[in-house]
């Protein structure tokens, strides 16, 4: 009966008839590789003719005689005491001392003829090379002796196979490595853009089924060395022609020929086959160089007079993203002048001096800035004055009065300051002769002229000078009680001459 039961170890569901006599006597142990507790008890049973492991437990005896098995167990107990202690200490988990998660324990029920007897059955499981189940003590002294003998056999067999837990863990790790070959990599795409040998990428792309995390050929068409075109020329033409068509000549020389699009080979309409570095139907350059060059190493910009492609080769090159070479090197004079450390000026005199170079040093020493508007011809000694003058031509008025409900705009800052004095009533310009004060400097200059004119006509200084004074000064801003200003020299010249 036991032999028939052990022959059905591999079966997932043993028949109830074979386990009816043994299922009640054997306890339930913890077996991580089995799901059902009823089927786990049959994994370590074997016939008496096999050798390797022994399972301690109480079996039903037909006649109740167990003296021979007890004597054999007592003889082997002395030799295997140390091994049994080692096994019980190493594989014990909770419960009673010496109990193991990898063992089957007996219940201790007696048979029909006699109770408390146990049979020492040596067994070699079909899983001897994979699983190591260590039996421990049951419910009687005979079971403990049988467990010691089984531990000795297990210690001898432990040198050429692994325990259950270690073997299952190693098997699980190996299975993970076979299922997920890229688990141990530092970068998820390391093997894609940095292969150990040049043919790895092409082999992975040309190989049958690819994993979901691998970059397919739809993103960048990978080509193997010696091929005339890419793997999917249609996808390359549709996805890479428009955005990268203008960079074909530059990156073909850099070793990334798969980005170039062209006509040779029946792929495009430009010059050079798609995927080839030199045009025609020759061998295309690989995605990576044999020296382990990174993918991004080829994306170095190439700046030069011929780096910009023909506008007809790509619709993107004629747009705003790729400007022609003219604006880049168009005005070196303005760029040099901008960082020369002096104020910039675009007047005709300054441009002529810069065009002449060293010969225009005389023009630069003069510092004359002329207006470039035809018909104007005004010349200023400062660039700020010229810029203020140009605002008169353009109509720009950047200076705004912030007084309440005013908001007037002016072309020059001094005009704004003069306007603000009308709000505040400040008169900052005083006459040096009569100490009369004015708001504007031009009004003061006109007033000073009245003193010089009055000196020429000594007799006519009354009403004539008063009318002229009123015309020179702004009556609304001048004080009403201000006396008529006359110079002392003009008032009393005869008396002074008589005193002398």
Swiss-Prot record:
Cysteine disulfide partners in this protein: none
Localization per record: Nucleus
Record GO terms (molecular function): DNA-binding transcription factor activity, RNA polymerase II-specific; RNA polymerase II cis-regulatory region sequence-specific DNA binding; zinc ion binding
Top-level taxon of origin: Eukaryota
Compositionally biased spans, kind Gly residues: 453-467
BP GO terms, sorted: regulation of transcription by RNA polymerase II
Keyword line: DNA-binding, Metal-binding, Nucleus, Repeat, Transcription, Transcription regulation, Zinc, Zinc-finger
InterPro entries hit by this protein: Znf_C2H2_sf (IPR036236), Znf_C2H2_type (IPR013087)
SMART domains: ZnF_C2H2
GO cellular component, one term: nucleus
Protein name in the entry: Transcription factor Sp8
Organism: Xenopus laevis (African clawed frog)
Gene encoding the protein: sp8
């Amino acid at each position: 009966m036991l032999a028939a039961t052990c022959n059905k170890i591999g079966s997932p569901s043993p028949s109830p008839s074979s386990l009816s006599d043994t299922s009640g006597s054997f306890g339930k142990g913890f077996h991580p590789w089995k799901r059902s507790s009823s089927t786990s008890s049959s994994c370590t049973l074997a016939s008496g003719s096999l050798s390797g492991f022994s399972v301690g437990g109480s079996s039903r005896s037909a006649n109740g005689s167990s003296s021979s098995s007890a004597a054999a167990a007592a003889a082997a107990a002395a030799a295997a005491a140390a091994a049994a202690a080692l096994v019980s200490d190493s594989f014990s988990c909770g419960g009673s001392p010496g109990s193991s998660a990898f063992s089957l324990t007996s219940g201790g029920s007696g048979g029909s003829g006699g109770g408390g007897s146990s049979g020492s059955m040596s067994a070699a499981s079909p899983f001897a090379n994979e699983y190591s189940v260590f039996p421990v003590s049951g419910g009687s002294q005979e079971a403990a002796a049988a467990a010691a003998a089984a531990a000795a056999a297990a210690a001898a067999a432990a040198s050429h196979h692994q325990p259950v837990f270690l073997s299952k863990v190693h098997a699980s790790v190996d299975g993970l490595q076979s299922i997920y070959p890229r688990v141990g990599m530092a970068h998820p795409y390391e093997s894609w853009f940095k292969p150990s040998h040049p043919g790895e990428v092409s082999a992975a792309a040309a190989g049958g089924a690819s994993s979901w995390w691998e970059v397919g050929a739809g993103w960048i068409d990978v080509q193997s060395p010696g091929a005339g075109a890419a793997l999917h020329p249609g996808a390359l033409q549709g996805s890479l022609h428009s955005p990268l068509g203008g960079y074909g000549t530059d990156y073909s020389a850099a070793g990334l020929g798969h980005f170039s699009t062209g006509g040779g080979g029946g792929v495009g309409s430009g010059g050079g086959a798609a995927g080839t570095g030199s045009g025609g139907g020759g061998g295309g350059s690989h995605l990576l160089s044999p020296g382990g060059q990174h993918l991004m190493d080829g994306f170095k910009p190439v700046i030069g007079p011929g780096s910009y492609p023909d506008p007809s080769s790509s619709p993107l090159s004629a747009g705003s993203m790729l400007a022609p070479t003219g604006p880049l090197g168009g005005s070196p004079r303005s760029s040099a002048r901008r960082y020369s450390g002096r104020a910039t000026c675009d007047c005709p005199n300054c441009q002529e001096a810069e065009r002449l170079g060293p010969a225009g040093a005389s023009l630069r020493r003069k510092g004359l800035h002329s207006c470039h508007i035809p018909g104007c011809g005004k010349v200023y000694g400062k660039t700020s004055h010229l810029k203020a003058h140009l605002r008169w031509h353009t109509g720009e008025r950047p200076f705004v009065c912030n007084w309440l409900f005013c908001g007037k705009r002016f072309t020059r800052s001094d005009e704004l300051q003069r306007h603000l004095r009308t709000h505040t009533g400040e008169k900052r310009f005083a006459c040096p002769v009569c100490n009369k004060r004015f708001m504007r400097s031009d009004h003061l200059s006109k007033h000073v002229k009245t003193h010089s004119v009055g000196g020429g006509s000594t007799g006519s200084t009354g009403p004539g000078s008063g009318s002229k004074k009123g015309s020179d000064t702004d009556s609304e801003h001048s004080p009403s009680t201000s006396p008529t200003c006359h110079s002392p020299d003009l008032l009393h010249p005869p008396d002074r001459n008589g005193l002398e």
